[in-house]
Structures are given as C-alpha cells and as structure tokens.
C-alpha cells in the first residue's frame, strides 16, 4: 500500500514538471528574447546593405541598377518591390506565418542555430530600366568588341555628343547613340554592323557625315583639269596616305598653241625663207649639211646666220648653275639675273633625247620654252652631271638649239642634230660652232684634267 502511494506521488511530480516546462516554453519572456535577437540581426543586415550600397558604382540620373545580395534566413526582413528603397521590418510572428507560403522555405528547419537558407533581394529603383541592365550584367568587364559598348561609353562619358537632341528627364532618358567625329576613330573604323546599328538608332535625327579613314595608301583621284587653256601647263591628282596625310602627284599637259604664237614667229620664219632665197625654209641648203664636210658647215658665215646667231645670244636665258629640281615634275619659271626676266623651262632628260649618244657625260638636261616675247625660234639647252652641276664644257655640255622642238621637231633635227652627225660626233668642232652657254659664270665643269682627256679622245676618233 505504501509502495503504491509512492508511485502515485512520483507520477504526479513528473506531470507537474512537464506542465511547468510547457508553461515556460509558451511564456511572453521567451517571445521577448526572440524579438530582441531578431532586431539585432536586422540591424546587422541593414548595415551590410548600406556598406554594399556605398561601394556600388554611382550612376547618373535616369540610370537603373540591380543589386543582388545573399543573406541568412535568420534575418527576418525583405525589400518590397513596390517600395522606393526603405527597409520594412515585420514582427517575428508575421514572419513565421508568411514563411510557410514560400514553397522553397516551407520545409526549412528554422529552429537550428544556423539554418542553411539563402534569400535573394533585388533593389530596383525603377521598373522601366530593368531589362536593358540585365543584358549589361551578363559580363563581368566591358568587352570592347560587343555591339553595345558604344552605348555604355555614351552613358559613362562625362562629355556627351553635341548631336544629342533636347535633354530629357531622369526617367525618360533613353541615350540614343549619335556622334560626329568621335564615331569614326581612325584606329578602329566602323564595321558594317555598327553602321546598321547607328542608322537604326538615329533614324529620326539629322544626317551625320561619315569619314572613311584609309589604312595605308588609297586610290588616286582623277587628274585635275589642265592649269592652262592653251600652251603648256600642268595638272595634279591626290590620294590619301593615312590619317591627316595627302599625297600629290603632278604632270605636264600640252594644250593647243595659244592664239597669236604663230603670228609671233611668222616674221622670223619669213625672214629665214627670204634670206635663204627659197619660198620654203630649207635647212640643208642654208647650213650646207648636204655635204660630207664638217668644215663647210663650220665655215658657213651667211649674213642671215650672223644676224640670227646675234639674236639668239641676246634672246635666250643663261643656263642655271644647278639643275632646277622643280622642272623634273612640270614646267617651271626660273629667274634669269642677266636679263632680269623669268623664263619657262622644261625637262629634256627623257629617252627620246638620247643623252647617252649626244651628251654622254650628262645626267640631266633642260630646255627653255618659247614665249610671245621671243624674237627667234631658238631654245637654250643646258646639261648637268650626277651632282646636278652645270656642265660648261666637254662632250656632255648643252648647246643652244637654233630651232626649238616646240616649233618643229623636224627642223630641229636638220639644223641642230644633223650637223653633229655630219661631224661624226666630234663635239670639239661642233661646240666651236655652237659654244655652250655659261652666262652666269658658273664653275668650270669638268675639271681641266678630265676636259683635256675628252678633247684628245675626240681628236683621235
């Protein structure tokens, strides 16, 4: 009997102890402690969000940014999509009830010390710009080859293009890409797809000038019109040779003779015919080149020849001491100090001149051109060595042409070339009758030793 009473008392004590433990678990003190713990956790999470916000990239007005953060589920707070950016705290009871509505969290064990739960929170300033920014978030660093890198540059650059139209508000700014010279970077010209993107983006804007920079040398342009309408002139053409570089090429152009030039030479031609005693100018009879004797040609002292040679000496310019390089590209004016006039010269070094035969030591030659002021049909002929110095004597020296090639190439051959052939290339006898010009008193070229050597060779030949 006593034993039965003891067992009953022990069972009653266990029931009281169980009841006491149940009452303690459901007491308000426990809820208060949980609330304090949750508030402390929420403050820590809020500080973390502020730290992340301060370290994020600052964007201008109208820009959107998506923030992604991972936090433990023991921090009972969340950002509502409709709110501007302030954090909302819920009571612990409401949080526990709402937690059951999430399929992924309904079976989570929240009684553990560190529950393995991750919550994704998106901080969105505006719903308008969420889609474009998702495309930018796919890359960790800017890719310069991506089609939309220019849009990113336009937003991040502090200096925007002047072609952007009326400024918009922060929420309606769409940043269309337009540009002037910044668009055509010579280091990376626009590709075809970039041109299409630009034309679509700026369909409603004004037309922009596109510059195509050529890497290296481009195609030559068409030749420009001749600089003169009659006579001898020049024309040019250009091409691009890179950034801020233009190559220019020029050439001579021969137009029909200017009106009046035939009249200017008519008197001289008539005088030649009259003095020769024939109706036509016969060079072979005048200079006696129809014979095989070089002496007869050298001793021809007709009155016409004396008068003509006197006019040639005063009418023609003196040879420049150095080859005028501008003549190599086109005709050029060179000032003559003796006559105090400008004379027009052209190059005479081409293959048809046959310098290796008639002027064997010459590298360059020039010939004066006829003008309306000319009183004869003659032209000055000057030749230069490899160092562009005037050859004043010897077998390479130039001699005056009594008939210019401009007037008649056939007469020039009969009067100026054929006598040299009749003399069998003996330049010493030819130059005696047609002395080379050195009116500007240039230094003797070649030197005495070379000159005498050439003279002896001519005599022996």
Curated annotation (Swiss-Prot):
Family: Belongs to the isthmin family.
Single GO biological process annotation from the record: negative regulation of angiogenesis
The species this protein was found in: Danio rerio
Pfam families, per the entry: AMOP, TSP_1
Gene name of the record: ism1
Domain of life: Eukaryota
Compartments where located: Secreted
Function description: May specifically influence certain angiogenesis process.
Chief localisation class: secreted
Signal peptide segment: 1-26
A GO CC annotation given for this chain: extracellular region
Glycosylation sites: 33, 282
Induction description: Up-regulated by Wnt signaling.
Disruption phenotype: Morpholino knockdown of the protein causes disorganized intersegmental vessels in the trunk.
Protein's recorded name: Isthmin-1
InterPro entries: AMOP_dom, Angio_Inhib/Adhesion_GPCR, TSP1_rpt, TSP1_rpt_sf
Alphabetical UniProt keywords: Disulfide bond, Glycoprotein, Secreted, Signal
Ranges of residues in domain TSP type-1: 215-259
Skewed-composition ranges (Polar residues): 40-58
């Amino acid at each position: 009997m006593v034993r039965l009473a003891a067992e009953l008392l022990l069972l009653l004590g266990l029931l009281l102890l169980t009841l006491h433990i149940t009452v303690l678990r459901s007491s308000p003190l426990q809820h208060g402690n949980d609330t304090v713990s949750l508030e402390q956790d929420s403050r820590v999470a809020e500080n973390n969000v502020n730290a992340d916000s301060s370290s994020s990239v600052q964007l201008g007005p109208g820009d959107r940014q998506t923030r992604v953060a991972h936090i433990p589920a023991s921090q009972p707070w969340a950002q509502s999509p409709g709110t501007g950016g302030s954090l909302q705290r819920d009571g612990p009871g409401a949080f526990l009830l709402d937690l059951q509505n999430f399929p992924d969290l309904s079976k989570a064990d929240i009684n553990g010390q560190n529950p393995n739960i991750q919550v994704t929170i998106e901080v969105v300033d505006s719903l308008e710009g969420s889609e474009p920014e998702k495309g930018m978030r796919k890359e960790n660093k800017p890719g310069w080859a991506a089609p939309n890198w220019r849009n990113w540059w336009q937003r991040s650059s502090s200096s925007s293009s002047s072609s952007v139209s009326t400024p918009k508000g922060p929420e309606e700014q769409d940043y269309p890409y337009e540009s002037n010279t910044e668009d055509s970077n010579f280091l990376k010209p626009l590709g075809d797809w970039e041109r299409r993107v630009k034309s679509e983006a700026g369909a409603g804007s004004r037309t922009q000038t596109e510059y195509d920079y050529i890497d290296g040398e481009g195609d030559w342009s068409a030749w420009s019109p001749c600089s003169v309408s009659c006579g001898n002139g020049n024309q040019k053409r250009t091409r691009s040779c890179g950034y801020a570089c233009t190559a220019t090429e020029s050439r001579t152009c021969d137009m029909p003779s200017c009106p009046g030039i035939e009249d200017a030479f008519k008197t001289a031609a008539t005088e030649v015919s009259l003095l020769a005693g024939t109706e036509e100018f016969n060079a072979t009879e005048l200079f006696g080149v129809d014979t095989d004797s070089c002496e007869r040609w050298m001793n021809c002292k007709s009155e016409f020849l004396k008068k003509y040679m006197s006019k040639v000496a005063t009418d023609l310019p003196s040879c420049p001491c150095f080859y005028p390089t501008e003549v190599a590209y086109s005709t050029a004016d060179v000032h003559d100090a003796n006559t105090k006039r400008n004379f027009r010269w052209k190059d005479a070094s081409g293959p048809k001149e046959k310098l290796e035969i008639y002027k064997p030591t010459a590298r360059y030659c020039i010939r004066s051109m006829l003008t309306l002021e000319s009183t004869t049909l003659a032209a000055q002929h000057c030749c230069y060595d490899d160092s562009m110095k005037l050859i004043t004597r010897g077998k390479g020296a130039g001699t005056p042409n009594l008939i210019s090639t401009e007037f008649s190439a056939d007469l020039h051959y009969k009067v100026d070339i054929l006598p040299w052939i009749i003399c069998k290339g003996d330049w010493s006898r030819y130059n005696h009758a047609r002395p080379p010009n050195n009116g500007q008193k240039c230094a003797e070229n070649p030197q005495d030793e070379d000159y005498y050597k050439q003279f002896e060779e001519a005599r022996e030949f």
